[in-house]
Protein backbone atom coordinates (compact mmCIF):
# COMPACT_ATOMS: atom_id res chain seq x y z
CA UNK A 1 0.00 0.00 0.00
CA UNK A 2 1.40 3.41 -0.95
CA UNK A 3 1.85 6.10 1.69
CA UNK A 4 -0.85 8.24 0.05
CA UNK A 5 -3.30 5.35 0.10
CA UNK A 6 -2.48 4.63 3.74
CA UNK A 7 -3.27 8.27 4.61
CA UNK A 8 -6.59 8.10 2.77
CA UNK A 9 -7.50 4.81 4.45
CA UNK A 10 -6.62 5.93 7.96
CA UNK A 11 -8.35 9.30 7.79
CA UNK A 12 -11.41 8.16 5.83
CA UNK A 13 -14.45 9.59 7.71
CA UNK A 14 -16.37 6.87 9.51
CA UNK A 15 -18.14 8.69 12.32
CA UNK A 16 -17.98 11.99 14.18
CA UNK A 17 -14.59 11.82 15.84
CA UNK A 18 -14.30 13.23 19.37
CA UNK A 19 -12.51 16.57 19.53
CA UNK A 20 -9.26 16.46 21.52
CA UNK A 21 -10.10 19.01 24.23
CA UNK A 22 -13.25 17.06 25.21
CA UNK A 23 -11.55 13.72 25.90
CA UNK A 24 -10.70 14.41 29.55
CA UNK A 25 -13.69 15.67 31.55
CA UNK A 26 -12.28 17.30 34.66
CA UNK A 27 -13.69 20.19 36.67
CA UNK A 28 -12.19 23.33 35.16
CA UNK A 29 -10.10 25.63 37.32
CA UNK A 30 -11.26 28.67 35.35
CA UNK A 31 -8.81 31.39 34.32
CA UNK A 32 -5.18 30.30 34.48
CA UNK A 33 -2.02 32.38 34.74
CA UNK A 34 0.17 32.49 31.61
CA UNK A 35 2.87 29.82 31.57
CA UNK A 36 6.16 29.77 29.70
CA UNK A 37 8.59 26.89 29.84
CA UNK A 38 11.61 25.95 27.73
CA UNK A 39 10.60 22.29 27.41
CA UNK A 40 6.83 22.70 27.13
CA UNK A 41 6.34 25.97 25.26
CA UNK A 42 3.83 28.52 26.46
CA UNK A 43 0.16 29.14 26.91
CA UNK A 44 -1.22 31.52 24.30
CA UNK A 45 -4.68 33.08 24.71
CA UNK A 46 -7.39 31.26 22.74
CA UNK A 47 -5.43 28.01 22.31
CA UNK A 48 -6.17 24.78 24.20
CA UNK A 49 -2.76 23.31 23.41
CA UNK A 50 0.52 24.73 24.65
CA UNK A 51 2.45 26.00 21.63
CA UNK A 52 5.85 24.37 21.94
CA UNK A 53 7.86 26.32 19.37
CA UNK A 54 11.32 25.63 20.83
CA UNK A 55 10.95 21.85 20.72
CA UNK A 56 9.27 21.86 17.31
CA UNK A 57 12.03 24.03 15.83
CA UNK A 58 14.66 21.88 17.59
CA UNK A 59 13.10 18.85 15.87
CA UNK A 60 13.57 20.53 12.50
CA UNK A 61 10.38 22.48 11.78
CA UNK A 62 10.75 25.96 10.26
CA UNK A 63 9.19 28.70 12.46
CA UNK A 64 7.35 30.06 9.39
CA UNK A 65 5.79 26.65 8.81
CA UNK A 66 4.47 26.66 12.38
CA UNK A 67 2.93 30.10 11.86
CA UNK A 68 1.41 29.07 8.51
CA UNK A 69 -0.37 26.08 10.04
CA UNK A 70 -1.51 28.13 13.04
CA UNK A 71 -2.91 30.76 10.66
CA UNK A 72 -4.98 28.15 8.81
CA UNK A 73 -6.41 26.97 12.12
CA UNK A 74 -7.20 30.52 13.28
CA UNK A 75 -8.88 31.49 10.00
CA UNK A 76 -11.28 28.54 9.96
CA UNK A 77 -14.95 29.36 10.52
CA UNK A 78 -15.87 25.69 11.12
CA UNK A 79 -17.78 24.63 14.24
CA UNK A 80 -15.68 24.49 17.40
CA UNK A 81 -16.19 22.74 20.74
CA UNK A 82 -15.29 26.04 22.40
CA UNK A 83 -15.72 29.18 20.29
CA UNK A 84 -13.02 30.86 22.38
CA UNK A 85 -10.36 28.24 21.50
CA UNK A 86 -9.02 28.16 17.94
CA UNK A 87 -7.74 24.57 18.04
CA UNK A 88 -11.06 22.92 18.93
CA UNK A 89 -12.57 22.57 15.43
CA UNK A 90 -14.80 19.49 15.39
CA UNK A 91 -14.22 16.78 12.79
CA UNK A 92 -11.39 16.02 10.38
CA UNK A 93 -11.61 19.07 8.14
CA UNK A 94 -10.00 22.44 7.46
CA UNK A 95 -9.17 24.27 10.70
CA UNK A 96 -8.97 21.10 12.79
CA UNK A 97 -5.55 20.84 14.51
CA UNK A 98 -4.92 17.24 13.44
CA UNK A 99 -6.15 17.87 9.88
CA UNK A 100 -3.96 20.92 9.30
CA UNK A 101 -0.74 19.43 10.69
CA UNK A 102 -1.34 16.09 8.94
CA UNK A 103 -1.99 17.95 5.67
CA UNK A 104 1.33 19.74 6.13
CA UNK A 105 3.01 16.38 6.81
CA UNK A 106 1.59 14.95 3.59
CA UNK A 107 3.27 17.75 1.62
CA UNK A 108 6.66 16.60 2.93
CA UNK A 109 5.72 12.95 2.44
CA UNK A 110 5.08 13.66 -1.24
CA UNK A 111 8.40 15.53 -1.48
CA UNK A 112 10.13 12.50 0.06
CA UNK A 113 8.55 10.13 -2.47
CA UNK A 114 9.58 12.38 -5.38
CA UNK A 115 13.15 12.99 -4.18
CA UNK A 116 15.80 10.78 -5.81
CA UNK A 117 18.64 11.62 -3.43
CA UNK A 118 18.33 9.07 -0.58
CA UNK A 119 19.65 11.36 2.19
CA UNK A 120 17.44 14.27 1.17
CA UNK A 121 14.47 11.93 0.86
CA UNK A 122 15.26 10.67 4.38
CA UNK A 123 15.25 14.27 5.67
CA UNK A 124 11.83 14.85 4.09
CA UNK A 125 10.47 11.63 5.64
CA UNK A 126 11.80 12.71 9.05
CA UNK A 127 10.18 16.13 8.61
CA UNK A 128 6.86 14.44 7.77
CA UNK A 129 7.16 12.17 10.83
CA UNK A 130 7.69 15.19 13.09
CA UNK A 131 4.68 17.02 11.62
CA UNK A 132 2.46 13.95 12.07
CA UNK A 133 3.56 13.84 15.72
CA UNK A 134 2.61 17.50 16.17
CA UNK A 135 -0.75 16.62 14.60
CA UNK A 136 -1.24 13.96 17.28
CA UNK A 137 -0.06 16.23 20.15
CA UNK A 138 -0.80 16.03 23.08
CA UNK A 139 -1.47 12.32 22.45
CA UNK A 140 -4.54 11.86 24.64
CA UNK A 141 -5.93 8.35 25.02
CA UNK A 142 -9.04 7.77 22.91
CA UNK A 143 -8.16 10.46 20.35
CA UNK A 144 -8.84 8.34 17.25
CA UNK A 145 -7.58 10.86 14.71
CA UNK A 146 -4.42 11.48 16.74
CA UNK A 147 -3.73 7.74 16.90
CA UNK A 148 -4.02 7.56 13.11
CA UNK A 149 -1.55 10.45 12.79
CA UNK A 150 0.81 8.57 15.13
CA UNK A 151 0.61 5.51 12.87
CA UNK A 152 1.60 7.66 9.90
CA UNK A 153 4.42 9.22 11.92
CA UNK A 154 5.86 5.82 12.79
CA UNK A 155 5.64 4.72 9.16
CA UNK A 156 7.38 7.91 7.98
CA UNK A 157 10.04 7.52 10.69
CA UNK A 158 10.82 3.99 9.51
CA UNK A 159 11.16 5.28 5.93
CA UNK A 160 13.49 8.06 7.14
CA UNK A 161 15.66 5.65 9.10
CA UNK A 162 16.35 3.56 5.99
CA UNK A 163 17.89 6.59 4.28
CA UNK A 164 19.64 8.58 7.02
CA UNK A 165 23.24 7.96 8.26
CA UNK A 166 23.85 5.19 10.78
CA UNK A 167 21.55 2.26 11.42
CA UNK A 168 18.18 1.98 13.13
CA UNK A 169 16.64 -1.29 14.25
CA UNK A 170 13.05 -1.72 15.35
CA UNK A 171 13.07 -4.03 18.35
CA UNK A 172 10.36 -5.88 20.24
CA UNK A 173 10.64 -6.40 23.99
CA UNK A 174 8.59 -8.89 25.98
CA UNK A 175 6.92 -7.60 29.13
CA UNK A 176 5.43 -10.25 31.45
CA UNK A 177 1.72 -9.89 32.09
CA UNK A 178 0.87 -7.93 28.97
CA UNK A 179 1.56 -7.00 25.38
CA UNK A 180 5.12 -6.68 24.06
CA UNK A 181 6.43 -3.19 23.32
CA UNK A 182 8.41 -1.83 20.37
CA UNK A 183 11.48 0.36 20.60
CA UNK A 184 13.95 1.91 18.17
CA UNK A 185 17.70 1.37 18.55
CA UNK A 186 19.67 4.12 16.79
CA UNK A 187 23.31 3.20 16.14
CA UNK A 188 26.18 5.39 14.91
CA UNK A 189 28.63 4.37 12.21
CA UNK A 190 31.25 1.83 13.21
CA UNK A 191 31.33 -1.58 14.80
CA UNK A 192 29.30 -2.33 17.89
CA UNK A 193 28.52 -3.13 20.55
CA UNK A 194 27.98 0.53 21.43
CA UNK A 195 27.63 2.39 24.72
CA UNK A 196 23.94 3.24 24.83
CA UNK A 197 21.58 5.85 26.27
CA UNK A 198 18.08 4.63 27.17
CA UNK A 199 15.74 7.55 26.48
CA UNK A 200 12.87 8.23 28.89
CA UNK A 201 10.66 10.81 27.18
CA UNK A 202 8.04 13.23 28.42
CA UNK A 203 4.36 12.34 28.70
CA UNK A 204 3.35 14.63 25.82
CA UNK A 205 5.92 13.26 23.35
CA UNK A 206 6.53 10.12 21.29
CA UNK A 207 9.74 8.11 21.10
CA UNK A 208 10.21 9.30 17.50
CA UNK A 209 10.51 12.91 18.76
CA UNK A 210 14.10 12.45 19.90
CA UNK A 211 16.02 11.84 16.67
CA UNK A 212 17.65 15.29 16.93
CA UNK A 213 19.03 14.33 20.34
CA UNK A 214 20.66 11.24 18.86
CA UNK A 215 21.92 12.88 15.66
CA UNK A 216 23.39 16.06 17.17
CA UNK A 217 24.66 14.88 20.54
CA UNK A 218 25.04 11.09 20.89
CA UNK A 219 25.97 9.82 17.40
CA UNK A 220 29.01 12.13 16.96
CA UNK A 221 30.46 10.58 20.14
CA UNK A 222 29.81 7.00 19.06
CA UNK A 223 26.91 6.53 21.49
CA UNK A 224 23.74 4.63 20.51
CA UNK A 225 20.24 5.67 21.64
CA UNK A 226 17.40 3.31 22.49
CA UNK A 227 13.86 4.69 22.71
CA UNK A 228 10.53 3.26 23.82
CA UNK A 229 7.19 5.00 24.21
CA UNK A 230 5.96 5.93 27.65
CA UNK A 231 3.08 3.81 29.01
CA UNK A 232 -0.35 4.47 27.43
CA UNK A 233 0.90 6.02 24.16
CA UNK A 234 2.29 4.85 20.82
CA UNK A 235 3.77 1.36 20.82
CA UNK A 236 3.20 1.18 24.60
CA UNK A 237 -0.49 2.14 24.38
CA UNK A 238 -1.69 -1.15 25.87
CA UNK A 239 0.10 -0.34 29.13
CA UNK A 240 -1.35 2.13 31.62
CA UNK A 241 0.98 4.42 33.55
CA UNK A 242 1.13 3.22 37.17
CA UNK A 243 3.08 4.19 40.28
CA UNK A 244 5.65 1.66 39.06
CA UNK A 245 6.39 4.17 36.28
CA UNK A 246 9.67 2.52 35.28
CA UNK A 247 8.20 -0.97 34.68
CA UNK A 248 8.59 -1.01 30.88
CA UNK A 249 12.05 0.56 30.91
CA UNK A 250 13.19 -1.95 33.55
CA UNK A 251 12.24 -4.88 31.32
CA UNK A 252 14.09 -3.26 28.43
CA UNK A 253 17.20 -2.81 30.60
CA UNK A 254 17.06 -6.45 31.65
CA UNK A 255 16.87 -7.54 28.00
CA UNK A 256 19.95 -5.58 26.87
CA UNK A 257 22.52 -8.38 27.55
CA UNK A 258 20.75 -10.27 24.74
CA UNK A 259 21.00 -7.37 22.26
CA UNK A 260 24.30 -7.84 20.37
CA UNK A 261 24.63 -4.20 19.23
CA UNK A 262 24.44 -2.80 22.79
CA UNK A 263 27.28 -2.90 25.30
CA UNK A 264 25.07 -3.66 28.29
CA UNK A 265 27.95 -2.81 30.66
CA UNK A 266 27.89 0.82 29.43
CA UNK A 267 24.30 2.05 29.62
CA UNK A 268 22.91 5.37 30.87
CA UNK A 269 19.33 6.66 31.14
CA UNK A 270 18.24 10.16 30.15
CA UNK A 271 14.87 11.49 31.33
CA UNK A 272 12.96 14.52 30.01
CA UNK A 273 10.20 15.89 32.30
CA UNK A 274 8.13 12.94 33.61
CA UNK A 275 10.65 10.67 31.90
CA UNK A 276 13.02 11.76 34.68
CA UNK A 277 10.60 10.08 37.11
CA UNK A 278 11.29 6.85 35.22
CA UNK A 279 15.05 7.46 34.95
CA UNK A 280 15.53 8.25 38.66
CA UNK A 281 13.50 5.17 39.64
CA UNK A 282 15.85 3.15 37.44
CA UNK A 283 18.84 4.73 39.21
CA UNK A 284 17.56 3.29 42.50
CA UNK A 285 16.03 0.00 41.36
CA UNK A 286 18.47 -1.02 38.61
CA UNK A 287 21.75 0.60 39.71
CA UNK A 288 23.93 -2.42 38.71
CA UNK A 289 22.69 -2.04 35.12
CA UNK A 290 23.30 1.72 34.83
CA UNK A 291 26.48 3.78 34.70
CA UNK A 292 24.66 7.12 35.00
CA UNK A 293 21.29 8.89 34.95
CA UNK A 294 20.72 12.38 33.55
CA UNK A 295 17.52 14.42 33.91
CA UNK A 296 16.20 17.59 32.32
CA UNK A 297 13.38 19.57 33.94
CA UNK A 298 12.48 16.57 36.13
CA UNK A 299 8.93 15.89 37.37
CA UNK A 300 9.70 13.79 40.42
CA UNK A 301 8.04 15.45 43.43
CA UNK A 302 6.75 19.04 43.61
CA UNK A 303 4.30 19.05 40.69
CA UNK A 304 2.98 15.68 41.84
CA UNK A 305 2.43 16.66 45.47
CA UNK A 306 2.01 20.45 45.71
CA UNK A 307 -1.51 21.78 45.07
CA UNK A 308 -0.27 25.35 44.48
CA UNK A 309 2.15 24.11 41.83
CA UNK A 310 -0.63 22.12 40.14
CA UNK A 311 -2.80 25.24 40.01
CA UNK A 312 -0.11 26.97 37.92
CA UNK A 313 -0.10 24.22 35.29
CA UNK A 314 -2.13 24.64 32.07
CA UNK A 315 -5.32 22.63 31.57
CA UNK A 316 -3.80 20.72 28.67
CA UNK A 317 -0.95 19.37 30.77
CA UNK A 318 -3.32 18.27 33.55
CA UNK A 319 -5.41 16.56 30.86
CA UNK A 320 -2.28 14.73 29.71
CA UNK A 321 -1.57 13.55 33.27
CA UNK A 322 -5.19 12.43 33.75
CA UNK A 323 -5.15 10.64 30.39
CA UNK A 324 -1.94 8.74 31.15
CA UNK A 325 -3.33 7.65 34.53
CA UNK A 326 -6.59 6.50 32.91
CA UNK A 327 -8.58 9.08 34.94
CA UNK A 328 -10.61 10.69 32.13
CA UNK A 329 -13.64 11.39 34.34
CA UNK A 330 -11.94 12.02 37.67
CA UNK A 331 -12.41 15.14 39.77
CA UNK A 332 -9.41 17.38 40.32
CA UNK A 333 -9.30 16.21 43.94
CA UNK A 334 -9.12 12.53 42.91
CA UNK A 335 -6.40 13.38 40.37
CA UNK A 336 -4.38 15.21 43.05
CA UNK A 337 -4.58 12.25 45.42
CA UNK A 338 -3.41 9.87 42.69
CA UNK A 339 -0.60 12.14 41.47
CA UNK A 340 0.83 12.34 44.99
CA UNK A 341 1.51 8.60 44.83
CA UNK A 342 3.84 9.17 41.87
CA UNK A 343 6.18 11.42 43.86
CA UNK A 344 9.49 9.60 44.27
CA UNK A 345 9.88 11.25 47.67
CA UNK A 346 6.48 9.94 48.80
CA UNK A 347 7.49 6.52 47.45
CA UNK A 348 10.50 6.61 49.78
CA UNK A 349 13.14 6.65 47.04
CA UNK A 350 14.35 10.24 46.68
CA UNK A 351 16.22 11.33 49.77
CA UNK A 352 17.72 7.89 50.25
CA UNK A 353 21.33 7.38 49.20
CA UNK A 354 21.59 6.22 45.57
CA UNK A 355 24.73 4.52 44.19
CA UNK A 356 24.13 5.68 40.59
CA UNK A 357 25.72 8.99 39.45
CA UNK A 358 22.94 11.49 38.66
CA UNK A 359 22.84 14.85 36.88
CA UNK A 360 19.82 17.15 36.81
CA UNK A 361 19.38 20.21 34.62
CA UNK A 362 16.78 22.86 35.44
CA UNK A 363 15.55 26.34 34.54
CA UNK A 364 14.82 28.94 37.23
CA UNK A 365 11.10 29.59 37.76
CA UNK A 366 10.13 26.52 35.73
CA UNK A 367 6.42 25.98 36.59
CA UNK A 368 6.71 22.21 36.05
CA UNK A 369 10.01 21.52 37.77
CA UNK A 370 11.40 23.82 40.49
CA UNK A 371 15.09 23.87 41.35
CA UNK A 372 14.31 21.93 44.56
CA UNK A 373 13.43 18.80 42.55
CA UNK A 374 16.80 18.84 40.80
CA UNK A 375 18.61 19.46 44.10
CA UNK A 376 16.73 16.53 45.64
CA UNK A 377 18.01 14.30 42.84
CA UNK A 378 21.65 15.41 42.86
CA UNK A 379 21.96 15.45 46.66
CA UNK A 380 20.78 11.82 46.81
CA UNK A 381 24.00 10.52 45.25
CA UNK A 382 27.69 10.92 46.04
CA UNK A 383 28.34 11.69 42.36
CA UNK A 384 25.69 14.33 41.63
CA UNK A 385 25.81 17.33 39.31
CA UNK A 386 23.34 20.23 39.39
CA UNK A 387 23.10 22.14 36.10
CA UNK A 388 21.28 25.46 35.86
CA UNK A 389 20.29 26.37 32.29
CA UNK A 390 19.68 30.12 31.75
CA UNK A 391 16.38 30.83 29.98
CA UNK A 392 17.49 33.42 27.39
CA UNK A 393 18.58 33.02 24.66
CA UNK A 394 16.42 29.94 24.93
CA UNK A 395 17.55 27.91 21.89
CA UNK A 396 21.30 28.52 22.35
CA UNK A 397 21.16 27.71 26.07
CA UNK A 398 19.08 24.58 25.43
CA UNK A 399 21.76 23.37 22.98
CA UNK A 400 24.58 24.28 25.40
CA UNK A 401 22.80 22.45 28.23
CA UNK A 402 22.41 19.31 26.11
CA UNK A 403 26.10 19.46 25.13
CA UNK A 404 27.09 19.63 28.82
CA UNK A 405 24.78 16.75 29.70
CA UNK A 406 26.19 14.66 26.83
CA UNK A 407 29.76 15.43 28.00
CA UNK A 408 28.82 14.23 31.48
CA UNK A 409 27.19 11.03 30.16
CA UNK A 410 30.11 10.30 27.82
CA UNK A 411 32.65 10.50 30.68
CA UNK A 412 30.71 7.85 32.59
CA UNK A 413 30.07 5.58 29.59
CA UNK A 414 33.27 5.79 27.58
Swiss-Prot record:
Q: Which reaction does it catalyse?
A: a carboxylic ester + H2O = an alcohol + a carboxylate + H(+)
- Any one GO molecular-function label of the UniProt entry: carboxylesterase activity
Say which enzyme class the record assigns.
hydrolase
Query: Which residues are in coiled coils?
Result: none
Asked whether the UniProt record includes Cytoplasm among its keywords, one would answer no
- Top-rank taxon of the source lineage equals Bacteria
For this UniProt record, the keywords arranged alphabetically read as follows: Hydrolase, Serine esterase
Q: Name the Enzyme Commission number(s) assigned to this protein.
A: 3.1.1.1
Q: Which Pfam families match?
A: FrsA-like (PF06500)
Q: What does this protein do?
A: Catalyzes the hydrolysis of esters.
Q: Which family does it belong to?
A: Belongs to the FrsA family.
Q: What is this protein's name? A: Esterase FrsA
- From which source organism is this entry? Escherichia coli O17:K52:H18 (strain UMN026 / ExPEC)
Amino acid sequence: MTQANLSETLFKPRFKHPETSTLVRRFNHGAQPPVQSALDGKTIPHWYRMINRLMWIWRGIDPREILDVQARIVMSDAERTDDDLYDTVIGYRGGNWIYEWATQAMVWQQKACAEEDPQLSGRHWLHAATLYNIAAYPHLKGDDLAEQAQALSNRAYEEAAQRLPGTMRQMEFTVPGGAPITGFLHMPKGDGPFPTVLMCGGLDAMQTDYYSLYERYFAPRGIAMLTIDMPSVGFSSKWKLTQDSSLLHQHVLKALPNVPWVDHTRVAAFGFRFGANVAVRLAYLESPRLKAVACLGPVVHTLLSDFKCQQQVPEMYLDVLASRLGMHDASDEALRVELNRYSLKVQGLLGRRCPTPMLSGYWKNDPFSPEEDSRLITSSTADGKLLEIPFNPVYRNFDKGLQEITDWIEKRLC
